[in-house]
């Protein structure tokens, strides 16, 4: 599963050379859980609810202070990563990127249409997604 989202100002936690070894250990991300943005936390929870084990997040899977050549290669591979993922979680609501994914932790009060995907997960929509995306910052990004 991949996460495509707008970072927002001052990303709380990213992968850097200093924490790479710790993050590479099994369950290494648990140590940093409180430092993760709500959007990333919600995407992790959603990935688990989908029954999947892996989530690719650019801020955590690309070493942000890597040398230029390594970082350029990683950035050039992003299209392939998104294309070959099982599915992409698209967090296109850029009004407040730190709010997380609506409806993952707290139930939504808005009326919406649902399609049940599993016993614990439903897909919901209350608007025409294509019109919504045209107006978002997310739509201006190169690999979406």
Where are the predicted features?
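Fold-level signal for large, globular catalytic cores of enzyme and receptor domains
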Residues: 1-143
């Amino acid at each position: 599963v991949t996460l495509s989202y707008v970072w927002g100002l001052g990303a709380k936690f990213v992968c850097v050379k200093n924490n790479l070894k710790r993050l590479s250990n099994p369950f290494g991300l648990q140590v940093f859980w409180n430092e993760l943005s709500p959007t990333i936390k919600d995407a992790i929870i959603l990935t688990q609810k989908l029954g999947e084990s892996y989530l690719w997040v650019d801020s955590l899977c690309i070493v942000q202070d890597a040398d230029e050549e390594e970082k350029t290669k990683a950035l050039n591979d992003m299209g392939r990563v998104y294309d070959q993922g099982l599915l992409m979680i698209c967090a296109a609501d850029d009004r407040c990127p730190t709010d997380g994914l609506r409806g993952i932790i707290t139930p939504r009060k808005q009326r919406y249409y649902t399609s049940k995907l599993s016993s614990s997960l439903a897909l919901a929509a209350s608007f025409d997604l294509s019109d919504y995306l045209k107006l978002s910052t997310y739509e201006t990004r190169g690999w979406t």
